[in-house]
Amino acid sequence: MASDLEGKAVLITGASTGIGAAAARAFARLGSRVAVHYNTSRDAAEKVAADVRALGGEASLVGGDVTDGSVIKRIVAETLNAFGRIDVLINNAGGLVARTRIEDYSEAFLQKVLALNVIHVALFMREVIPVMRRQKKGNVINVSSIAARHGGGAGAIIYAGAKGFISTATHGWAKEVVGDGIRVNAVSPGVITTPFHERYSTPEQLKGMQATIPMNRLGTADECAGTFVYLASDDLSGYVTGQVIEVNGGQYMP
């Protein structure tokens, strides 16, 4: 199953912790070559890279702030230098920045949320799609959020809107590049136990979220990882493009 991913070059942004790290390990088990991106958490990224190698994959570290377009160019160049190609791009980096009420919005805050969750994804597309076009094949997997479905809680509305953009743009990008042998999909995680919620959600908030989930528990990063493998594998999902796959324990159903 997913044996076609052996040797494939996979660039994962935000791969030092959480869902990105779990995805890196999942691809490693299949023999993929993984570019593990980090911003400030180099030690954590080095641990993930060591895990990738121990699990049977190859690993390369790529670091930098994805809100800087010149850094994105360098990350892509370093990945190509390490692996010679990019078969799978996973746009996982992102963040809430801060829970901010409407009356406290500043231009700097709004720009930071959009840079971290929208603009850098478009810039990675700009840099990687030409590479995949030359290869005549490739897979892009964006990361949306359940917040795109319900608009986010208090203080998280701009983040939710940014993730709504990712879901919508995934449909459009998929149509634009389908003729080039490139598939574009998205994974939309629900409430997952990662550093994201450790930072931005209180235990009381998480308890309230859990009460709305039919499975009556929060998800794990490892439970998201299989969806990335599925979407990256042409053997498993070769006829799937332009889709947003929900991984949320049944909290929201189409």
Language-model-detected regions and their locations in the chain:
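Conserved mid-core segment of classical short-chain dehydrogenase/reductases
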Residues: 73, 96-111, 134, 154-158, ...
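Active-site helix of classical SDR
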Residues: 125, 162, 170
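Alpha-helical segment proximal to the catalytic Tyr-Lys
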Residues: 130, 171-176, 238
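C-terminal substrate-recognition "lid" of short-chain dehydrogenase/reductases
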Residues: 4, 218-247, 252
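Catalytic Tyr-X3-Lys loop
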Residues: 103-123, 137, 141, 166, ...
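Residue(s) in the substrate-gating loop at a strand-loop-helix junction
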Residues: 145
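Conserved glycine-rich cofactor-binding loop
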Residues: 9, 16-17
